Amino acid sequence: MANIAALEPFVGKEDPVELFELIEEIAEGSFGTVYKGKHLPTGNIMAVKIIALDEDETFEDLVVEIDILNRCNHNNIVKYYGSWVKGDELFIAMECCGGGSITEIYQELNIPLNESQIAYVCRETLKGLEYLHHTNVIHRDLKGANILLTESGDVKLADFGVSGLLDKSSKRNTFIGTPYWMAPEVIENRSNPVPYDTKADIWSLGITLIELAEAEPPLSEIHPMKVLFQIPYRDPPKLKNQENYSKDFINFIQSCLQKDPNQRKTATELLKHPFVTNTKEKAVLTDLITKYRKFRAAELEEGGDEDEDSSEQEGMDSDDKDSDLKKSVGTSDRKSTLIANGSTSSLSPPASPSQRKSTGQNLQLPQIIEQQSSSSSSSSSSSLSSQSLQPQAVNKSTDRLSANINGSNTKSNTIDKKTTAAASASASSLNLSTGNLQQSLSGSGSITTNSGVGNGTSGKPTTNGKSSDDRSPDIRTNRKAGRPVTIRKTLEKRNDAVKKIVNAKLMKQQLKDIKKQQQKQQEEEEQLLKQQQKEKDDLLKQNAAKATQQQKQSAAKEEKIQKQHKVEKETLSRQQKADREQLLKKNQSDCSKQRTKVTDQQKQQQREFKDQQKQQQKQKEHEFKDQNKVLDKSTPKKLSKHIAIHQKVIREQEICVQDLVFQQKQDFQKLVDDHQNATQNLFLENKQQSEQLFAWHTQQNQQFQFQQQCQLENYQEYHTVLRENMNAEHQLAKSQLEHSHLSETNHLKERQVTETEQHIKQMTTEQRNSLKEFKLKQTQDFKEFLNKLKKELKDEKGNKKQLQQQHKEQKKQFELTLSTQEVDFQKKQARQKEEEDDILLTHQKESFKRLQDKQQNIIRDIEEHCKLQRQQFETEYTFNEEEMLIEHYRQKKALLKQQHSEQKQIYQEQTQLQYRLLQEQHKESPALLTDQHLKQKESIEEQQKERLTLQQEEHRIQQESLKKQEQKKKGSVTDLPASLASMQLEQSKQLQLLSEQLQAELATMFERHTKETQSLQAELAKAQEKLQSDQQKLLHDLTEEQKKSKLKLKSESPSCKENPLHMKKKSTGTTPPSTSSNQKTLNNSNGASSNGHHHHHHQSAGVGGSGGTISSSHNTPVLPHNMKHQRSFSTSLPSFKFDNQD
């Protein structure tokens, strides 16, 4: 009794025999017998359920039932008061429902429920189901027999023996329930684990509503095993006469009986249906309950009278027989249940009213009745052996027949022999049927009948040799207490009880064998799964090890390449530094040499210019002397002195102007020479830098090509390893799928074979049962005929011949009727066989179709999986190749970018230097011009002042001369009047000529100065145009080189536009050695420093007439001042195009 430990949390410590007094037997549930009992401490009436605890029994279902009852606290669920253990029996005290179950009511009264009664019962059951479903409980055995009524008309749900507990989000995968009320998704759990939930109870509710309306469930005329095959493939059942019912009732049943559980409504949703909302209260059921109680009371009284008569006739021997029969028939009305995964449920449907009239089934069993004929003797009844239970009932019937026919003639004796032979044949066929049933149930392993519970509740005097105190309170103790116990059992009920007892023993053995087989299969499957998992793990480990080794090798190669690259970078940077220092030294030496040469040339030119000036001065002095001589002759001494002074000033001014022009020319030549030297030096430096960059880029390209080759080789090796691993995994998966497919096909074939065998065995058992019934009817008819003959023989002894003739005629008639009945019976059997063969064929075809569909689906899944894996492998391989090409392309692009940026830097430095030179020139040239203008203004002002002074002196001299002449006139009025007038005229003429000469010389001086300034400006403009043209040519060459490199890259770039797996990645190109550290101003080497990875601001340089900017007319672009460079060089994939091209 080790399993009783599972019940300890729910079991009380009191003695149930002292707590309860049993009044009568009410019914039998899925686990035990239910009695009406009185709780002695309080005097309350309760329902006491007594269950026999066998050692072979599993207690999980008992624990589940008690746990659910203990949890539930609702008005529509049977209340639970407690549980106790006494010996090997469990006592469960629950609420007593005196109204009985709904099936008992409509079976006993032979009247189905009307629609208003059904609506009330439906509403109350829905309330109970709603509570259960909210607490995650599935009833799984909802039917009319499990819906109880109290005496006041309250509806209660009972019998949780096969219920299941759910988690919040889980579903069940067990095959439990009663076949006629079972949902399709629950039936499908026979072979495949199909999950189901609380919606299964809604289907059962719909079937119970049809049961209440029609007094039997749908498909009740079919055997329960056949129903299991037909429910999943048939349309949902409907009411037979739908015209007699309301639309709401029909619609409610349709919403319950949806084959798809997702379309089925919940209990809370169904409570809002108009069929339920418009119901009346429990007063609807009061009439039914009162009728049923009256019927039960009358039945109990009749049973008591029959017991008294039989007890007076039989005596002590019959009491002993009754006790033996109670032992054998204690489980006669147990429900046949379906068991899967160790749980039970009832199989057989309740009989219809017509069947109950003929057979007398489904009566309550508080009493066991035995009918015996008054003519049976005590010797024949006492001589019966109680070793085998099944032949016992048959032998009793034969003894009664022989006792009735004792005194007849020889013909009657022969007939009696025939009847005894038929009875023995029926007994043997019954034993055969039990054997066949055992074989059929051992083949399937899914269907059993739970009838072994009544052994402990049918009145054993002692259990396993224990004392009388340990036995449970039963009908015997009730009889001793003075309560009436009626015993009414027909011969058919006894035979059924015997069959159930035999079948229960067989079922237990079969269940044990099935469980052992299932355990073995599970162990084998677990071992196979473990082996497969081990193989998979080993493969995965090998693949991971290979992948890690390859990754390590590739990482080591990359590290070596990076180290070499760093070393090469360092060497290149050192070489570049050394080259730059050498270039700087050379440039400085060249500049110093050129400056010395220029200074020497300038000195020589100055000397030559001075010599020329001296010669010109000598010539002019000679000319002036000649002129002075002429003037001296004609003019007075003072004027000659003034003129000489004036000529000296003019000479000095001319000499200053010539010196200024010569100095300007020399300065401009110096500037031009310096500019040419600087441009040549820059050009040489740029050439050297471009050559170095070209050499560095070629080295880098070679290194990248080598890296790419190494990476491609690594990828190829990695992909070969991956292919091998994938092939191995595919082969493993194929073998596993083939193995699983073979196992499934074998399992399905075995299942088909077992199902066919079960079906054939059921057919044979049904045929045998029908034959037995037919033979029993024949024997009854024959008995009646013999009784009539006996009476006629007693009454008319003299008319033997007439009686013989009548007997022959009746015999012939009886043989004819027998032959016709046999023919009809054979035809019925043939029809039944044809129908069953058709059902079997359809079922086999459907199962074969399912097998084919499953095979096709598995093959499709395998093919799709292989295709997906191939596609993934191909895409990964192509993607890796494309990534390599893209990386190569990006690296090339980065190198080109670096080249372009370096060229830009060089060009920018050149432009900056040119702009600085032009600015210096611009600064120097206007300063010289302003100095010249100032000097010219000063000289002109001085000349004007001298002119004014000369004119004043001339005027003063003229006045003095006039005064002298007047004095002379006064002295000698008449001396030389003509000579004075002539002298005045000559003097005026000379003054005019001198002023004109001075003005002409000044005008010529201005013209010369303007011409020289214009020529200087024109030369500066030409020089600037040359510089700009050179710059534009350089830019044009750079742009053409860039375009060529772009075209080369485009021709070499991979075509990855259509690949959707490419992601946009940032280019990580290697940077060339930077030239920022050694770039300085013009005096040192090259100009301002720049960074290779950023956009630069370019400045424009131009000189106008008075310091303005000049826009070149060439097609090549001149970059404006303070403006970002418009080239972005973005490598956005998969387009592989520059965003902004020139």
Swiss-Prot record:
Its EC number is 2.7.11.1. Disulfide bonds: none annotated. Residues 300-322 have a biased composition (Acidic residues). Residues 716-1050 form a coiled coil. Residues 355-365, 391-413 have a biased composition (Polar residues). It comes from the Eukaryota. ATP binds at I26, A27, E28, G29, S30, F31, G32, T33, V34, K49. The active site is at D141. The keyword ATP-binding applies. PANTHER family: STERILE20-LIKE KINASE, ISOFORM B, STERILE20-LIKE KINASE, ISOFORM B-RELATED. This is Serine/threonine-protein kinase dst2. The gene is dst2.
